């Protein structure tokens, strides 16, 4: 069941492994969702990557950002006022009290992972250790997909289906645009350069899938 109209919906982006595109997903998904929602991005990762990203830019990202790692405060994410949607960039440590607090508070978990077998194995472990016990709605998002060959991503989706783990239909393809946008403190929706439109379209498709889910 989703939150009532007086409370924001909470979407947490998590994976127990670093380097999978977690912060990139959180920032760009927040930007894509902000086209229709008033969005707050909460940086709950002690590394502060989302905050670093935002501080590099001079233009507004299209959403507000707050840094918070206190588990007691993270338990109350649904009580945040003034927003219809809260996106959380979580810490990568599965035994983190902050992560546990966010998972319990979340309405939806987005689980980014590259489609490579080793990355997928770590993601499946994350699902069993941190996601399934919570009972929170979740979907895997395949990231860093080679745009020249989608076969590995298709195979990864098949593996997830066989294990009963839901996944987004959309992929996030690997473009240099993502790194360059981050270095300039911009979301992929704001960055202008090679493959910018393709990269933006990927995140808009993910946002549309989430929106369809919420309207069911």
From Swiss-Prot:
The keyword Magnesium applies. This is Maintenance of carboxysome distribution protein A. One of its GO terms (molecular function) is ATP binding. One of its GO terms (biological process) is carbon fixation. CDD domains: ParAB_family (cd02042). Its EC number is 3.6.4.-. Mg(2+) binds at residue 23. McdA and McdB together mediate carboxysome (Cb) spacing, size, ultrastructure and probably inheritance in the cell, together they prevent Cb aggregation. McdA is an ATPase that forms dynamic gradients on the nucleoid in response to adapter protein McdB, which associates with carboxysomes. The interplay between McdA gradients on the nucleoid and McdB-bound carboxysomes result in the equal spacing of Cbs along the cell length. PANTHER family: P-LOOP CONTAINING NUCLEOSIDE TRIPHOSPHATE HYDROLASE (PTHR13696), PARA FAMILY PROTEIN CT_582 (PTHR13696:SF52). Its main location: cytoplasm. GO terms for cellular component: cytoplasm; nucleoid. A type 2 McdA protein. ATP binds at residues 18-19, 21-24, 47. It is found in: Cytoplasm; Cytoplasm, Nucleoid. Keywords: ATP-binding, Carbon dioxide fixation, Cytoplasm, Hydrolase, Magnesium, Metal-binding, Nucleotide-binding. It catalyses: ATP + H2O = ADP + phosphate + H(+). It comes from the Bacteria. Has an adenine-nucleotide sandwich dimer structure in common with ParA ATPases. Nucleotide-binding forces changes that create an ATP-binding pocket. Homodimerizes in the presence of ATP. Each subunit binds 1 ATP molecule; some residues cross the dimer interface to contact ATP in the other subunit. Forms a complex with McdB. Belongs to the ParA family. McdA subfamily. Pfam families: CbiA.
């Amino acid at each position: 069941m989703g939150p009532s109209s007086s409370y924001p919906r909470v979407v947490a982006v998590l994976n127990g492994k670093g380097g999978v595109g977690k912060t990139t997903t959180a920032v760009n998904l927040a930007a894509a969702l902000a086209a229709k929602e008033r969005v707050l991005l909460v940086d709950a990762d002690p590394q502060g990557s989302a905050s670093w990203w935002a501080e590099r830019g001079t233009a507004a990202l299209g959403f507000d950002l707050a840094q918070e790692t206190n588990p007691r405060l993270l338990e109350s994410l649904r009580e945040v006022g003034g927003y219809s949607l809260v996106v959380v960039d979580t810490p990568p440590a599965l035994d983190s009290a902050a992560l546990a607090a966010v998972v319990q508070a979340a309405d939806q978990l987005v689980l980014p992972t590259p489609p490579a077998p080793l990355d997928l194995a770590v993601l499946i472990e994350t699902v069993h250790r941190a996601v399934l016990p919570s009972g929170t709605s979740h979907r895997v998002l395949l990231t860093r997909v080679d745009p020249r060959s989608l076969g590995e991503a298709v195979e990864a989706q098949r593996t997830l289906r066989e294990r009963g783990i839901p996944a987004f239909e959309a992929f996030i393809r690997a473009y240099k645009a993502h790194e360059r946008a981050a270095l300039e403190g911009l979301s992929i929706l704001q960055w202008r350069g090679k493959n910018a439109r393709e990269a933006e379209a990927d995140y808009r498709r993910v946002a549309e899938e989430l929106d369809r889910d919420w309207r069911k």
